[in-house]
Design a protein with these regions (language model features):
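A short beta-strand micro-motif
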Residues: 2-9
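Acidic, low-complexity, intrinsically disordered interaction modules
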Residues: 12-185
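Short acidic DE-rich linear segments
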Residues: 191-195
């Protein structure tokens, strides 16, 4: 068994700036025997088109492996695109306090409130008489600091790390029912057949 690299490019539609495309990269595991079958078919039929090779009917096991690999690659590429879009457009409805507490405990977010940086003496006198408003102000300042920290933290994540973070801690909810993809022969195998 060996891993063969596969790639894809999908157009998700149009935006005001042109076509929105996503690229996927993955790998499919095939045995030497399966690779030999593909090489032989490509040479015999002088084609690399999966439909023309009729893999689905005559070699369903190979077709299934390729189909699953290309589908998963396309799904992953489209999924992470929409997750990032959802994050940047504020579409996730998560518990702000819960996320802030998690990030303080597990990820290093810390907040130290220094009244002199935010309030002058008159403000502080006012808040002495209204401690509840003072606590509200501190909370608002902390939330603002947290969102700045969160933006920096998330922008430093890889796609896989971001995917996990969005689902596990920001209540991302995404259902992709209709992922478009094509099943192809890995380029390395095509090159082998053309030698």
């Amino acid at each position: 068994m060996a891993l063969y690299s596969i790639e894809s490019e999908q157009c998700l539609g149009m935006s005001h700036s042109g076509a929105v495309t996503v690229n996927g990269e993955s790998a499919v595991e095939l045995s030497d025997e399966e690779v030999d079958i593909l090489v032989r078919l490509i040479k015999e039929k002088d084609s690399t088109d999966v439909k023309e090779l009729d893999l689905e009917n005559f070699h369903p096991d190979i077709y299934k492996k390729l189909d699953e690999a290309y589908y998963q690659m396309a799904y992953d590429a489209e999924e992470i695109h929409w997750l990032w879009e959802g994050y940047y457009n504020g579409c996730f409805e998560y518990d702000d306090d819960g996320l802030m507490a998690y990030c303080e405990k597990e990820l290093g977010f810390s907040f130290e409130f220094k009244p002199e940086e935010y309030f002058d003496e008159d403000d502080l006198e006012y808040y002495k008489e209204d401690p509840e408003s003072y606590e509200d102000e501190i909370y608002d300042v902390k939330c603002e600091a947290f969102h700045e920290w969160l933006s920096d933290y998330v922008s430093g994540l890889s796609d896989d790390e971001a995917r996990d973070f969005f689902y596990n801690h920001m209540d991302a909810d995404l259902n992709l029912d209709d992922v478009e993809y094509t099943v192809e022969i890995p380029q390395t195998i095509i090159a082998k057949a053309q030698q």
